[in-house]
UniProtKB/Swiss-Prot annotation:
Belongs to the universal ribosomal protein uL29 family. It comes from the Bacteria. CDD domains: Ribosomal_L29_HIP. The lineage of its organism: Bacteria, Bacillati, Cyanobacteriota, Cyanophyceae, Synechococcales. GO terms for biological process: translation. This is Large ribosomal subunit protein uL29. Pfam families: Ribosomal_L29.
Amino acid sequence: MARPNAAEVRQLSDTDITEQINGLRRELFQLRFQQATRQLANTHRFKEVRIKLAQLMTVQSERQRSAAS
């Protein structure tokens, strides 16, 4: 899964961003569960999911701040 750049993330709608954030949070939970039960094969996936989640949450908070102003 290639990481999207900031321009690609900013082109998404608010609902798409929210859906992706929720999906990534679920995936991160599942990865933690798999790691705890020693079933996780791809440990690098943690980093990928966290980075993508941070990008989406940053864009979401930027939009909320600009809407509040």
